[in-house]
């Protein structure tokens, strides 16, 4: 009886392993998908930088270039080398987002976009902020400064207990 249950378990295990091994999956590689998103982000950044958004409409990657081939979204290049799985139909059913909510770095202006130009001014203003306050007059500091000191204390970067902040 024990040999029969052991052999039936081994048979079920072998069947499950072989049934999963026969099926081959094909999908669009994540690298190609990320490259498309990065390319479209830079394209949108250039449009924002030139401020011609009214004349030129920038569209996110459309779903027409991707085909639903029962296993995911695939490019036309990837369709030539793909194999049909059949059983993994509903793994990827949501698709790509229609609009990217990411602001590209190229769209930023001023000191945020080019911090190297304003580096000297930022260093001087930081030094002035450090020289202004004493630790005895911590009420003059904004709340953010006291929170920062508390976080430094909690991280263990200073050699004093947290209640002395």
Curated annotation (Swiss-Prot):
It comes from Mus musculus. Its main location: secreted. Residues 1-21 form the signal peptide. GO terms for molecular function: melanin-concentrating hormone activity; signaling receptor binding. This is Pro-MCH. Belongs to the MCH family. It is found in: Secreted. It comes from the Eukaryota. MCH may act as a neurotransmitter or neuromodulator in a broad array of neuronal functions directed toward the regulation of goal-directed behavior, such as food intake, and general arousal. The lineage of its organism: Eukaryota, Metazoa, Chordata, Craniata, Vertebrata. GO terms for cellular component: extracellular region; nucleus; synapse. Keywords: Amidation, Cleavage on pair of basic residues, Disulfide bond, Hormone, Neuropeptide, Secreted, Signal. Predominantly expressed in hypothalamus. Also found in heart, intestine, spleen and testis (spermatogonia, early spermatocytes and Sertoli cells). In brain only mature MCH and NEI peptides are present. In peripheral tissues a large product, encompassing the NEI and MCH domains of the precursor, is found predominantly. Disulfide bonds join 153-162. Pro-MCH is processed differentially in the brain and in peripheral organs producing two neuropeptides; NEI and MCH. A third peptide, NGE, may also be produced. Preferential processing in neurons by prohormone convertase 2 (PC2) generates NEI. MCH is generated in neurons of the lateral hypothalmic area by several prohormone convertases including PC1/3, PC2 and PC5/6. Residues 66-89 are annotated as: Disordered. The modification Isoleucine amide is found at residue 143. One of its GO terms (biological process) is chemical synaptic transmission.
